[in-house]
Each structure stands twice: as structure tokens, then as C-alpha cells.
Amino acid sequence: MTTLTPFIPLNFPITAIVGQEAIKLALLLGAIDPGLGGIVIAGRRGTAKSVMARAIHTLLPPIEIIKGNRYQCDPKNPGSWDDDTLEKFADVPLDQLETQVIPAPFIQIPLGVTEDRLLGSVDVEKSVKQGEAVFQPGLLAQAHRGVLYIDELNLLDDQIANQLLTVLTEGKNQIEREGMSFQHPCQPLLIATYNPEEGPLRRHLLDRIAIALSADGILGLDQRVAAVDQVLAYADSPISFIDQYDAELDDLKTTIILAREWLKEVSLTPEQVSYLVEEAIRGGLQGHRGELFAMRVAKAIAALDGRSDVQADDLRQAVELVIVPRSVLMDNPPPPEQAPPPPPPPQNQDEGKDEQEDQQDDKEDDKDNEPEAEQDPPSIPEEFIFDPEGVSLDPSVLYFAQMAQKQGKSGSRSVIFSDDRGRYLKPILPKGKVRRIAVDATLRAASPYQKSRRLRHPDRQVIVEQGDIRGKKLVRKAGALIVFLVDASGSMALNRMQAAKGAVMQLLTEAYENRDQVSLIPFQGENAEVLLPPTRSIAMAKKRLETLPCGGGSPLSHGLMQAVNVGMNAKRSGDIGQVVIVAITDGRGNIPLARSLGDEIPEGEKPDIKAELLEIAAKIRGLGMQLLVINTEKKFVSTGFGKELAQKAGGKYYQLPKATDQGIASMARQAIADMQ
């Protein structure tokens, strides 16, 4: 027996959205094949990103589930059932299962979601009553066979995003926690949106999602006017507005249902697979996800058109939707290969020319007399998209590819995990003293044992023991500290100091957004002095760097130790996650550390300054700091020790006799990006 649950959608019709044809096609393909791999829509505010995501949900057909099942299990597919359902209906024939039809779910993941809320946890109330751990489904369980929507994907916690995509890739959620082992299906259509102005999306996440497009394409005047008219009409009377598109929406719903059936019959030939792989190679894609996603997209396109065979246009569209946005070559296509020169004409060419023309005329006459044969559409495109003379692409595809290239290796700064301050990420088993108790997780851990504990202590309502206590794992964003260590001795000292000062001012202009801090330590004479403590203040930097000390000896050992101490103190503050030491020096220190610290050096003993420097470099590496050595001396006078110093610290060495503030700042940025 089947029960039908009524549902009246009020989402903006997808057919009423002006423009965005590539995105609408991608969403339709996702509706046909929810296991496609997900769709990401990038765009600024007001570009209908979330409107399109919700609009496609209206087109999804209702789903039949086992009546009362919390995981939307398909009664015809026992292979995808959760553990409880498999155990409960192990001996029940499929045709005797009681079912119901419900709307496909639409679940939105909030930005502050915890791991327990996403993946599921212990149901405290039921566990207390039953005396055993009972699983409470999370958001991923509720989204099975529906739409899982993430707004502002770029702002979602990295660990949460990785766990979410792992579950979607595997198609199931395996829970192993608090004395409980359980698995349930999770196969929704993933749709995510984000605004690039609020921060870039990590390339790692982008690589795990099938289709990524931009909604920032420029609309013409007529299209903008039409879009405004549509929005006003919908706001005035949503039901009347939707009624105008009922016929179109019904046609699309039918198309999706039929296409899902066609999809079961669609297959690719080996030649077509080779074409997609070749396009991925030409586009410079890393890994195999690109071509695998493109194969599923091509099959979904054929199914959408009501065909079981994949044609050349299907492959071309799949490349545009999947491979092009991933390409690293769109901004710099390879130069065209020069065609070989034509062979020289034979000496008797003129003599045989008339005879060849007569033969050609005879062939054309024969062709005219033959019946016209029907030509099948080609199964493989005649040219590659990643050719120098490539085909024209949809602006939304190209825009996203170029945007991803501009993004480069930039991304969110590091995060710091702690147990004292930050955003609550997940509960953890405490090691030692618990600074902040996770009350929710503690109660869940204690709930299965309440029944037995009350027998021992009938006068107490809730009994929590030491083994139930869970702590909070907290996370907060952290910036980077760039410590400029500048050799202020010698004739070129002033040039080095001016370049470092310019780099400091450049990086400080970007410091607020990234939470970065900058410090400057010149070393000259007998010791090194922290001229600019870690700061994000441009005003403070200008004031402190008005006078630049120069001349004297080169106490490089003391300078490196000062930089290490500044970095360690900054990390202890909890606001800094990465430390980069940029040493602008040739590596020729001539003042031992003991002398800089005021310690007595035994008479007749000569300190090994080189060994001292290498020991400090090893310490820098052990502390997880990055060392960049920039040698501004000319190559023919360089000792080469600066390179050895950088290698010992696991850092990088640059020979730049004419180092500029822009170049130094760029190297520091790259070092931070490499540490992420």
C-alpha cells in the first residue's frame, strides 16, 4: 500500500530565469544523474545562484520510500539500505513492503554546522529509554535521494567540507563512535554556491566536484529588463506567476523521468573515452577526476536528448562543462604547430592537368546518379577544444576558468585547533584536564547507561561519570607572521634595508584581510635588534622604520635567534599559525652568538660560526618555520653558504643582486602559500 504526500512548490521556476543557459543545463544533468559529482555555481550577490539551486529541486520527481523510514531508503534497492532497515526487513519480500511517496528532500548545510549535526550522533532521549546507544540521523541522512545545498561553500570549515565530500563520494555514511557502528546511504544531488568576493574556493574542493560554472556573465540590456520584470511579477503574486509556467515545468519533469530511464542504456565507446582523456591531457588536468566526471556528463546529455548513443556534441559539451573550468592552460594556449611545406609540383603537372579534370568530372557525374545516403551524426568531435584554434565557449565556462587561474595558489590561511577558544568544531576524548566540556557529547555518551546506573542510584535523575566527559575541539582562523631579517652591515646595507622596508609596507596593506603580521629585525654591529615587532599597523611600521641603522659587523647568528624567538612568541599568542623568516643576507656572519649575548669566550678558543648557524637553521626546521634566504650579492663574490643555510632549514635560496621590494614581497607570499 502506498501513501501519497501532497506538495505545493513555490520556488521560482527555472524556465523563468533569464539567461544562465549553461548553468541551467548543468542543473538538469544533475537532476537526471544525482551521482554526477555535484555542481558549483560561483557569482556575486544578486546573480540568482540560490534561486537556480532551489528551482531545480521543484523539478525532481517524488521518491518512493519504505514507510516511516528515516533514511529515504528505496524499497526496490535493498543494496542501499541502512543497517537497521536491512535487519528489520531481512525476511520480508520486497513486494510486501509498505511504502509511501514523499517529495524529494531539500537540505541546506549551515555554515556553523558541527560534525555531529552533519554526520549524525547518539539520540540521547531514545538511548536513555532503551538503555543502549541509538543513532540520531544527521543532515546527510536527511538529504539522501534529494538535494543537498551548501551556500557559501568557500566559507565552510575545511574539515567539515572534506568529510562531507568523502561521504558523497562513497555514497554512504559510516559512523564509528561512542560504542556505536552504523552505516546509512547518502546519495543526494550536491549543489553549492559561493561568492568569490568573500574568499576563493580551495582548488582541492573544486577538483572533487564535477561541474563548476560562474553566474557572473554580463547580460544585455533587454535581458536585464526581462529579469527585473520577472522578479517583480513573482513578488506580486507567486502562485499566479508559477501557474504561467506549469506546462513547461511539467514537460521538464517528464523529461527528467524519461531521461533517468534512458541513462541506464547509455554507454561510451572506447574511442569516445580516448577523446575525453586526450582533452584532459591537453588541458593540463591533474588526476583522473576530470575525465571520469566528463564521461558521466556526456552520458547524461545523451539521456536528456532521449538517446542511448553518445554523439560528438555530447562530448564537446561535457568538455566545456567539466574539463575547461579545470584547465590550467586556458590563459596560455600552446602555440600552433607549423604545417609542413607543400611538396613541389611534378614536372609534368601541366600535361596531366586536363586528363585529371576529365576524370574528376566523371566522378562527380557518378555521384549525382547515386542515391543519397543518410549520414549518421559523428560520434567524436572533429577538432579538440584545446587546440590553438579552439571552438568558441560559453562565457560562464571561460569566466570561471580564468577566475580560477587568477586565484592561483591563494586561499584561506591556516587554522589553529585548541581546547580554550574558537568555534566549536567537534567533541573529543580529553587528554588530561578538560578546559571546556562538550555538554551535548557528554550527555550522548552517558545516555545508553542511564537505565543501569539508576538501578544503583535511584535518587539521581542524570548520572554522568568521568568516562563520559567529552571536551570541545575548537578551531579559529590564524594568520602568518613574516619576519624580515636584514643584514644591515656592509656597503650595500642601505639598499637592502630600503627593499625590506618597501616589502613590509606592501605586505601590511594586505595584512588585515589575511590576519597576517609583519616584523623587521636588522642585524649589524654586535647584535640584532627587533626594530619592528609583529604588527598589522601601517602607522606603527612607518614610525618605527623612519631611521634605518647600517654599518658594522654581521651578527647573523643572533639575528636568526631573534627571529626564532619572535616567531615562537607569536605562535604562543594563538593568533599566528605560520612563521616565515625572510633573511636578506649573503650568509657570511662574523660575530659569534656568545659575543652578541654578552657571554665570555674562553681565551684562545675560536667559535665555529658556520656550525653555529647550521645548528640554528636545523632548529628553525624543527619548529616548523619556513626560511627564505635572499642573497643580494653578485654571484662571483658569493660564498655559497647562504644556499647551504637554506637547505639545512628546509627552506629556499634566491640569488637576487637587484632585489626589489615587489620581488621580496612576492617571495614571502609564495612561501606562505607553499606552507598551506
Curated annotation (Swiss-Prot):
Keywords recorded for this protein, A-Z: ATP-binding, Chlorophyll biosynthesis, Ligase, Nucleotide-binding, Photosynthesis
Annotated segments matching region Disordered: 328-387
Gene3D superfamilies: Magnesium chelatase subunit I, C-Terminal domain, P-loop containing nucleotide triphosphate hydrolases, von Willebrand factor, type A domain
Residue intervals of the VWFA domain: 481-672
Top-level taxonomic group: Bacteria
Gene Ontology molecular function: ATP binding; ATP hydrolysis activity; magnesium chelatase activity
Catalytic activity: protoporphyrin IX + Mg(2+) + ATP + H2O = Mg-protoporphyrin IX + ADP + phosphate + 3 H(+)
Annotated EC: 6.6.1.1
Pathway as given in its UniProt record: Porphyrin-containing compound metabolism; chlorophyll biosynthesis
PROSITE patterns according to UniProt: VWFA (PS50234)
CDD domains: AAA (cd00009), vWA_Magnesium_chelatase (cd01451)
Name of the top EC class for this enzyme: ligase
GO biological process, one term: chlorophyll biosynthetic process
Pfam families recorded: AAA_lid_2, Mg_chelatase, VWA_2
Chain intervals with Pro residues compositional bias: 332-347
Keyword Metal-binding among record annotations: no
Biased segments, Acidic residues type: 352-375
Role this protein plays: Involved in chlorophyll biosynthesis; introduces a magnesium ion into protoporphyrin IX to yield Mg-protoporphyrin IX.
Protein family (similarity comment): Belongs to the Mg-chelatase subunits D/I family.
Name listed for the protein in its UniProt record: Magnesium-chelatase subunit ChlD
